[in-house]
Amino acid sequence: ERFSATEKIMKTTLNTEVPDNLPQSKHAIVILGYALADDGTMREPLIERLKVGLAAANKNPNSKIIVTGGVPKQGNTEAKLMKEWLMSNGIAEGRILTEDKSTDTVENALFTTAILEKEGLKDVTLVTSASHMRRALTIFTEASDFYDKMIAKNSDRAFTNVVYLDYPSIEEAHNVTKDEAMVIYRDLMRATGVWQY
């Protein structure tokens, strides 16, 4: 069942533009972090993800924004700098929730799902690089299912996506390589294993 869900996710259309019909209530835009440079500054992929997240936030003014990423460098976490960048680009501080403990995609998903549950947020638009999106969707779906089992409810959470295109073309972005598939299944197995014990 898990694998068939993942195979479906691998066929997901990656959106390079913010979709028009996103939910208008109980909706979160989740922007995934990217490792900071050694000097504690944001690298290009993270800034590009933020630009996509900003476009989604401006188009959906009722949505909360969750910035996710720990791993401190020079006293900064990804989430801290992401929040500062969004605020400097006109997003109100009250809209932004930070998840600054995670060190990888599995933890991003687990810790962010806890925030979604706590804040009563249902549906999610994930924002990350095209090369990372299928893995992120797989793990976030698994995290949501795990929480549902743990608290004995069905959140019926819907995931949408907007990507920063880090491929020469969208056609290439939609081609799942063997390496990418292996990493997705590895993280899925790890996520499932981590959460069972």
What are these regions (language model features)?
Residues 1-28, 32-35, 87-89, 93, ...:
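Extended hydrophobic blocks
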Residues 31-62, 66-86:
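Membrane-embedded segments
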Residues 32, 68, 99-101, 128-129:
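Short His-Asn-centered micro-motif
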Residues 39, 75-76, 105-108, 134-136:
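Extracytoplasmic/secreted cell-surface and envelope-processing proteins
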Residues 39-46, 98, 175, 179:
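Short beta-strand elements at the ligand-binding edges of bilobed clamshell
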Residues 47, 102, 106, 110, ...:
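Glycine-rich phosphate-binding loop at the start of an alpha helix
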Residues 64-66, 97, 125:
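A structural signal for isolated positions on well-ordered beta-strands in alpha/beta enzyme cores
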Residues 70-71, 96-106:
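Short beta->alpha junction loops
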